[in-house]
Design a protein with these regions (language model features):
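Active-site nucleotide/adenylate-binding loops and adjacent lid/helix of ATP-dependent enzymes
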Residues: 1, 72, 76-78, 85-182, ...
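Conserved N-proximal alpha/beta basic substrate-recognition cap immediately N-terminal to
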Residues: 7-110
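Short glycine-/acidic-enriched loop or helix-start segments at secondary-structure transitions
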Residues: 14-15, 58-60, 93, 142-143, ...
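Conserved residues at the C-terminal ends of beta-strands
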Residues: 50, 114, 199
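Short secondary-structure boundary segments
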Residues: 51, 135, 197
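Phosphate-binding site of ATP-dependent enzymes
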Residues: 145-241, 245
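Conserved active-site loop/cleft motifs that coordinate metal ions or position small ligands
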Residues: 253-256
Length: 256
């Protein structure tokens, strides 16, 4: 039996369809409403964790913390957990992500973390430009905004404070400019590289494949149809083995 721990019905729809077609028995633990009995042994099976750092945007604040406790319960009883507590810990904090990446000599842009507008203003005065803001705990590009200078940031500071990060921590990060308006996202399953996505960033940073993928209609012959996410065939990059080693060391099974 496969148990899926999640908090977003929309994201799970393709999995339901595929697992049903495969004849794979599965049970959903929607962690915003379901609470297992932690005083007994968990059921036998494989537990697949689909918890997201953006849970609070769907009214599910506190659900990742509850899930972290449930994962410790599963792991204590020796259950097979895909993307367990170590993976969730990194999912919920970009600061911890960056520290883990740097510990493996993987490149990370210059980044500062702060908790108050005063701290952000002080840090921004000396930031190389351009730079971006980010929420420490977020998905879908929440809180990401580009600034080309300190004056522009100072003007926007009050507006930024109106949508504070759920954990109270905002990041300032040097913006890595690209000659073209896209990034490449590498997808890993079982800790191994599977495929790459070319992600169109021309319309902003709030990007999530589960929400924004545009699947072309085979009957649509329009040449103007734009895909925000496109699979790149036979993608090769020397950094991929280093990513695979990082995922292995951090006990991350599935990642992008």
């Amino acid at each position: 039996m496969l148990y899926i721990l999640h908090e977003n019905d929309q994201w799970l729809a393709p999995f339901r369809e595929t697992f049903t077609e495969m004849g794979l028995p599965f049970s959903e633990w929607h962690m915003a409403s379901f609470l297992p009995d932690l005083t007994v042994e968990p059921p036998l099976g494989v537990f697949y964790v689909r918890m997201s750092a953006s849970a609070h945007t769907r009214g599910h604040s506190g659900v990742p913390e509850l899930t972290a406790g449930v994962l410790c319960w599963l792991e204590r009883h020796g259950r097979c957990v895909i993307n367990g507590s170590a993976a969730l810990d990194l999912e919920l904090s970009k600061v911890r992500q960056y520290q883990a990446l740097m510990a493996h000599d993987l490149p990370v842009p210059l980044t500062y973390a702060a908790r108050s507008p005063e701290q952000l203003l002080s840090l921004a005065r000396n930031m190389p430009c351009p730079f971006v803001t980010k929420h420490n705990r977020a998905g879908m590009g929440l809180g990401v905004e580009r600034f080309d200078g300190f004056d522009a940031f100072e003007i926007r500071l009050d507006a930024l404070a109106e949508t504070p990060p759920v954990d109270g921590v905002t990041l300032l990060q040097v913006y890595i400019d690209s000659p073209e308006s896209f990034i490449t996202r590498c997808e890993f399953i079982g800790g191994k590289f599977v495929y790459a996505l070319r992600v169109d960033t021309s319309d902003g940073f709030e990007l999530c494949p589960a929400d924004n993928c545009s699947v072309p209609d085979q009957h649509d012959s329009s040449e103007t149809k734009i895909l925000r996410f496109e699979i790149v065939a036979d993608y090769v990059d020397p950094i991929i083995p280093r990513y695979e080693n990082f995922l292995h060391e951090q006990q991350i099974d599935i990642a992008g």
